[in-house]
């Protein structure tokens, strides 16, 4: 069994994990029945883990979202699809490995699946550029989404990036233009689009594949205009104030659901998705199937209208009205 990577606030579980591993080794090396002791320790560890994860701060949720063993885009795709075919290239000489996409089927419905892909170790992260896509990655994604729109395939996107790559080469190749073009084009696609934030949803890098009819988000994922570290450095000239920035930025699923930015918060297993990836995959698949079933019943015109209205109300100053009241007011004005 691979060794689990424990976060700072999970340190109270270290001793329990050691005891559980020792008992498992004893069971392997002898015929002694230790099932009862093992069950008691695992139950205790699960209970303590639930207590810890019930009261996570926004800064701690960021640590969970960045966990190196958290399920990635490819992990979820492999759970969903037996017929996944990856498509490569932006048709302009590049094939960014930080943003992947391809064809598959979910519950017998052909779909396009795409998303950011991080690595599991240093070597993989270098290949994947730590999940930070370059302009070619967003142009590849756009090419695949245009293909999906042409052949009436729903689009499923998975967001997990600290942000778009901000190096000099990316700026020279038109990073801002590539993301802006994706935003514009995604508003016009006449197929259902479901986006899920499975880890980090960082800035424009997340938005580049995040214009969707339904925006889902895991319980311990984060969605932010800038990383708390960057925000703290800009506002207070002190990166140590990142925890305060994380709270002020409203980056958690609970906050974003209240603000009307996302449509559903998906629950995670005790300890986060990295503790039970199959359970996380089943949760995500069930939610996607439910939302996709609803969206497929809508006409192309209804999809476009709903998508436009959804984003039109974001960022509007709210003094006393609820998000629902503003949406209703906006719809009435259009009529």
UniProtKB/Swiss-Prot annotation:
InterPro entries documented for this protein: Acetyl_CoA_COase_a_su, ClpP/crotonase-like_dom_sf, COA_CT_C
Catalytic activity of the protein: N(6)-carboxybiotinyl-L-lysyl-[protein] + acetyl-CoA = N(6)-biotinyl-L-lysyl-[protein] + malonyl-CoA
Entry GO terms, CC: acetyl-CoA carboxylase complex
Predominant subcellular localization, coarse grouping: cytoplasm
Pfam family, one: ACCA
Pathway(s): Lipid metabolism; malonyl-CoA biosynthesis; malonyl-CoA from acetyl-CoA: step 1/1
Domain of life: Bacteria
One biological process term in Gene Ontology: fatty acid biosynthetic process
Keyword check for Cytoplasm: yes
Its EC number(s): 2.1.3.15
Domain CoA carboxyltransferase C-terminal: 40-294
Keywords carried by this UniProt record: ATP-binding, Cytoplasm, Fatty acid biosynthesis, Fatty acid metabolism, Lipid biosynthesis, Lipid metabolism, Nucleotide-binding, Transferase
GO molecular function: acetyl-CoA carboxylase activity; ATP binding; carboxyl- or carbamoyltransferase activity
Protein localization: Cytoplasm
Assembly with partners or alone: Acetyl-CoA carboxylase is a heterohexamer composed of biotin carboxyl carrier protein (AccB), biotin carboxylase (AccC) and two subunits each of ACCase subunit alpha (AccA) and ACCase subunit beta (AccD).
Entry-linked PANTHER family: ACETYL-COENZYME A CARBOXYLASE CARBOXYL TRANSFERASE SUBUNIT ALPHA (PTHR42853), ACETYL-COENZYME A CARBOXYLASE CARBOXYL TRANSFERASE SUBUNIT ALPHA, CHLOROPLASTIC (PTHR42853:SF3)
Role, per record: Component of the acetyl coenzyme A carboxylase (ACC) complex. First, biotin carboxylase catalyzes the carboxylation of biotin on its carrier protein (BCCP) and then the CO(2) group is transferred by the carboxyltransferase to acetyl-CoA to form malonyl-CoA.
Family membership noted in the UniProt record: Belongs to the AccA family.
NCBIfam families, per database record: accA, AccA_sub, PRK05724.1
Protein name (database record): Acetyl-coenzyme A carboxylase carboxyl transferase subunit alpha
Native organism: Prochlorococcus marinus (strain MIT 9515)
């Amino acid at each position: 069994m691979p060794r689990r990577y424990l976060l700072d606030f999970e340190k109270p579980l270290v001793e329990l994990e050691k005891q559980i591993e020792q008992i498992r080794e004893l069971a392997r090396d002898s015929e002694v029945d230790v099932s009862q002791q093992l069950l008691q320790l695992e139950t205790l560890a699960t209970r303590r883990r639930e207590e810890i994860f019930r009261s996570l701060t926004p800064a701690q949720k960021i640590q969970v979202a960045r966990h190196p063993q958290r399920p990635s885009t490819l992990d979820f795709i492999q759970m969903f699809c037996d017929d996944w075919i990856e498509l490569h290239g932006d048709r302009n000489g590049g094939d960014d490995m930080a943003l992947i996409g391809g064809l598959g089927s979910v519950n017998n419905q052909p779909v396009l699946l795409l998303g950011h892909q991080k690595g599991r170790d240093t070597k993989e992260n270098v290949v994947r550029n730590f999940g930070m896509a370059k302009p070619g990655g967003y142009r590849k994604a756009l090419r695949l989404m245009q293909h999906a729109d042409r052949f009436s395939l729903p689009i499923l996107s998975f967001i997990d990036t600290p942000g778009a790559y901000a190096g000099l080469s990316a700026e020279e190749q038109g990073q801002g233009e590539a993301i802006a073009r994706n935003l514009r084009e995604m508003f016009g696609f006449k197929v259902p689009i479901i986006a899920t934030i499975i880890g980090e949803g960082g800035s424009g890098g997340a938005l580049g594949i995040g214009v969707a009819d339904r925006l889902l988000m895991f319980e311990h994922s984060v969605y932010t205009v800038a990383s708390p570290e960057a925000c703290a450095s800009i506002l207070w000239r002190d990166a140590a104030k990142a925890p305060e920035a994380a709270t002020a930025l409203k980056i958690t699923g609970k906050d974003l659901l209240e603000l009307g930015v996302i449509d559903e918060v998906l629950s995670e297993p005790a300890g986060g998705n990295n503790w039970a990836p199959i359970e996380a995959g089943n949760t995500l698949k069930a939610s996607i199937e439910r939302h996709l079933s609803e969206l497929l019943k809508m006409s192309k015109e209804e999809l476009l209208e709903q998508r436009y209205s959804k984003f039109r109300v974001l960022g509007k100053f709210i003094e006393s009205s609820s998000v629902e009241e503003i949406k209703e007011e906006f719809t009435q004005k259009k009529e």
